[in-house]
A protein has these predicted regions:
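ANL superfamily adenylate-forming
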Residues: 1-25, 42-54
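Residue-level signal for pocket-adjacent positions within structured domains
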Residues: 2-3, 8-11, 33, 58, ...
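Secondary-structure boundary/capping signal
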Residues: 12-16, 36, 116
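Secondary-structure boundary/capping residues
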Residues: 16-17, 37, 66, 84
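A structure-centric signal for secondary-structure junctions around beta-strands
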Residues: 22, 34-35, 66, 91
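Conserved adenylation A10 loop of the ANL superfamily
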Residues: 25-40
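Conserved AMP-binding/adenylation subdomain of ANL enzymes
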Residues: 43-68, 72, 76-116
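Beta->alpha turn/N-cap motifs
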Residues: 120-121
Length: 121
């Protein structure tokens, strides 16, 4: 049994009575320059229900189950974090670069047959 399975076995298998969808905790340095978690209200829906924004963004960016998203940016930023989360929610594959390097980026696009990515000019 793996460590994950062992840890998981300590919790009940029955679902929570009223399980709600979670939300990402984003951080801002604000005026102090110190990280501060931005607490947002949780959506009043179950994890099985898609958020309305999912349909909009998946149509806009053509996210789909067979997509491969390459993330060259740090995941503490809201844009790459949102793109990675949406890719996973749609059933796609995510490739994350440890740090951006133009040559590595182009190599990854070819090696992983990347269909989606997000770059800053």
């Amino acid at each position: 049994m793996s460590d994950f399975e062992s840890a998981l076995s300590k919790y009940p298998e029955t679902p929570l009575e009223r399980e709600l969808l979670g939300a990402a905790m984003l951080y801002s340095s604000g005026p102090t320059g110190r990280p501060k978690g931005i607490v947002r209200p949780l959506p009043e829906q179950s994890p099985e229900e898609p958020l309305p924004v999912i349909g909009f963004l998946s149509g806009l960016w053509r996210y789909r189950e067979d997509m491969i998203y390459l993330s060259p940016a740090p995941l503490y930023h809201s844009a790459p974090q949102a793109a990675v989360g949406l890719t996973l929610r749609m059933g796609g594959t995510v490739v994350i670069m440890e740090r951006f390097d133009p040559a590595d980026y182009l190599r990854f696009v070819e090696e992983y047959q990347v269909s989606h990515s997000q770059l800053v000019p």
